[in-house]
Amino acid sequence: MTSSIVNKFPITREGFESMQVELEKLKEEKPSIIQAISDARDQGDLSENAEYHAARERLGFIEGRIIEVESKLSHAEVIEVKSLSGDTVMFGATVTVSMLNDDNSEVEYIYKIVSGYEADASKQLISTDSPLGSALIGKKVGEYVEVIVPNGEKLYKIVKVEFK
């Protein structure tokens, strides 16, 4: 008898719902791509039919992405961030940090610590596995973390930890 251990990964409610929306959109798009392939096939010679090849490529991408998103959703463990509390940085925390700029002026940044599946630096969502995210995990308000970045090292001070 063999047993398989399924690795669950944490994800925020927002991240889970975003993945569900993506899956729904992909499944809605698939029939129109199948129809485009059929229409292109009806045009005759497929060897020089760019529409056919583009539609087949798009269908392959969509089918692969559907499988990937379904797999992620089946292995996701939704963490209700609002039910967490404390002053220690952990998954789901919204962390305010400050650092000194090159001109010695202090600047604050706000990041939410999330899984790699929902990380998006442009939205200040950083992964627990990123250099800054992993440095912050387990630290408390008032503590400092040093992070190696391409142009050297940056020192961050944890100003606030929230769960919202």
Set out the residue ranges of the language-model regions.
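Helix-rich terminal scaffold detector
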Residues: 1-67
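Preference for short coil/turn "hinge" residues that link or interrupt alpha-helices
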Residues: 4, 39, 71-72, 119, ...
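Conserved NTP-handling cores and scaffolds of large molecular machines
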Residues: 27-30, 44, 73-77, 140
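Structured, basic alpha/beta domains of bacterial-type, RNA-associated proteins
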Residues: 65-72, 76-83
